[in-house]
Amino acid sequence: MADLITVARPYAEALMGWRKRAARNRPGRMHCRRLPAMIADVQAQAFLTDPERRDAEKVSLLSAVPVAVDVKAWKAFLALLIHNDRWPATAEIGTLFADAMRRAEGVVDVLVTSAIALDAGQKTAVQSALERRFAGHKVRFREAVDAALIGGLVIHTGDLTIDASVRGQVQQLARTLRS
């Protein structure tokens, strides 16, 4: 199967479109969390991969997840996932949908990875720079440590990665020297 994020993107976008068009009872984050949790169950996976089961039975299983949305539309969405054999991508669909919801609400999730833990002053400086970079959005800052970076930072949000690490600079130099 193709990369799950690539497979999941159009389904997450469809959910966002549905959310934007619906006046009320819109799909929310909770619906996209419950479904992957159900699919993670070994028995559910066995049921969904059973070639003897009809698509309607599989949709019936997945639609047992309680939702506060238009049930007919939700079942149609689930039927599409089943028919196209995209149900394994539900976790990624949920993640992408939640990301899109946060963006629509003006929130940008940023993961900042450094070689050593940032002190309070460094965190403040990075947070300020990110808020300037993503003006008009609330920046939700998460931090990780990866000693393999040697020094510097790697900033990741959505499709954007800024690699200002020593490791990244060394790798770039190596690529330049090879070409």
From Swiss-Prot:
Molecular function (GO) terms listed? Answer: proton-transporting ATP synthase activity, rotational mechanism
**Highest taxon in the source lineage:** Bacteria
Q: Where in the cell is it found?
A: Cell inner membrane
Cellular component terms, GO, for this chain's entry?
plasma membrane; proton-transporting ATP synthase complex
* Main localization of the protein described in the UniProt heading: membrane
Keyword ATP-binding attached:
no
Keywords assigned by UniProt, alphabetized:
ATP synthesis, Cell inner membrane, Cell membrane, CF(1), Hydrogen ion transport, Ion transport, Membrane, Transport
Return the InterPro entries for the record. Answer: ATP_synth_OSCP/delta_N_sf, ATPase_OSCP/d_CS, ATPase_OSCP/dsu
What SUPFAM superfamilies does the annotation carry?
A: N-terminal domain of the delta subunit of the F1F0-ATP synthase
| Purpose of the protein | F(1)F(0) ATP synthase produces ATP from ADP in the presence of a proton or sodium gradient. F-type ATPases consist of two structural domains, F(1) containing the extramembraneous catalytic core and F(0) containing the membrane proton channel, linked together by a central stalk and a peripheral stalk. During catalysis, ATP synthesis in the catalytic domain of F(1) is coupled via a rotary mechanism of the central stalk subunits to proton translocation.
Q: How does it assemble?
A: F-type ATPases have 2 components, F(1) - the catalytic core - and F(0) - the membrane proton channel. F(1) has five subunits: alpha(3), beta(3), gamma(1), delta(1), epsilon(1). F(0) has three main subunits: a(1), b(2) and c(10-14). The alpha and beta chains form an alternating ring which encloses part of the gamma chain. F(1) is attached to F(0) by a central stalk formed by the gamma and epsilon chains, while a peripheral stalk is formed by the delta and b chains.
Tell me the protein family, please. Answer: Belongs to the ATPase delta chain family.
How is this protein named in the record?
ATP synthase subunit delta
Q: Which organism is it from?
A: Acidithiobacillus ferridurans
The record's gene field reads atpH
